[in-house]
Amino acid sequence: MKTKAFISLIFLSILICCKSEKEKIFEKSIVGEWNFDKFIILKKENNPEEPPPLPFMAKNGYIFHSDKTCIFKPGFVSMIEGKSREENQILYLGNSTKYKIKNDSLKIQNLETNKWNNYKIVSITSDTMTLQKTEDELLKYYKTNYVINPNENYDKIIVSSSGCYGTCAIFDLLISKNDNSLFFGERYNSKNGIFSAKISKDLFKEIENSFKKSNITKLKNRYSSNWTDLNEISVTFIKDNKIIKTVSDYGGEAPDEFRMSYLRTNYLYQTLDLQNKKEILPFQSIGQVSKSNKLIYFEKSEIFYLFYLLLNGKELPAKKISTIYTLKGFGKNDEETEIKSDGRFFVFNNRLIDIGFNFFELNDFTNRNLD
């Protein structure tokens, strides 16, 4: 009897030891950066011709650290329903959370539900991680190894959201490495209005590097879904006052790394110390720009950059200028202000603002390639 108990104890010890070794292998292998690759459906649906669509937020990614913390790249959000659709809000909860591995189980703390999401680890290799989410569904991730160009640097990054047929946030956010940042919340934000804020150089660098992982200069100018009434995000990168690159993404069709970067930035304003910006202009947006009665096309983030320059320009005594461009500014109640400009000086309501350089010549909007 004692011999049997002794053998059972040895066998149990071996099992525990094996499990510990398995955990150690998984704990070591999981460290690094992983992006979502695809779903694998184990059991066919009744209608295999109609595979389930990939949820927008399913295209995610994680950065697992050895200290049992991880980054959920898009960040966790919570929907707060108001009394009316206008009062609905999305609150950003952060992107840093905890994880733990027990045997072949991976648990990730969900900041929205305050519960642990549970996955079975099917395998982790040097470049692929396969997790089982449900009995019928596997999630496959690929390991990333980004080489970030240290010589690619920007002074400002602008993210703008156009809204959709629903409650998608409408906003513009300009973050600056050296100057004050600017946020304009128009609708469906937890704060609406025009605000200034400061961000640290470390935070700017973190956001910049996140975007740089998508190889900014190699991205197309526009990505578009065939569906209607979706949200459009535009992102503009500025260096030495010049627009280096603008990428527009309608319906979340841009590469995953780029999309995850702007999703996180969409709610950055909720983490900043926003200060009400004094309204020194009779308009809070620019809706139209023309040259010789011909409209010039701008992405939303680009036109917000011009608004930012006007807001921070130097006001001079009014004088006559050679009018080359005509702009229309719009106030809170859509009241219209006509603005005349030669590219550097902007005249409206007997006021003159100097932005310090010729905005249109520097960026050559009339010869731009929109493809």
Predicted regions and their residues:
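Short, surface-exposed coil-to-beta transition loops
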Residues: 55-59, 92-94, 114-117, 166-172, ...
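Short, well-ordered, aromatic-rich surface patches in folded extracellular/luminal domains
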Residues: 22-32, 36, 101-103, 108-165, ...
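Short, solvent-exposed loop/hinge segments that bridge or flank secondary-structure elements
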Residues: 38-68, 166-177, 295-299
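Generic short beta-strand segments
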Residues: 36-42, 71-78, 160
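N-terminal glycine/threonine-rich, aromatic-flanked beta-hairpin/loop signature
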Residues: 51-101, 178-190, 194-201, 301-317
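Bacterial Sec-dependent N-terminal signal peptides
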Residues: 1-30, 34
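Short, internal acidic amphipathic alpha-helical interface segments
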Residues: 199-231
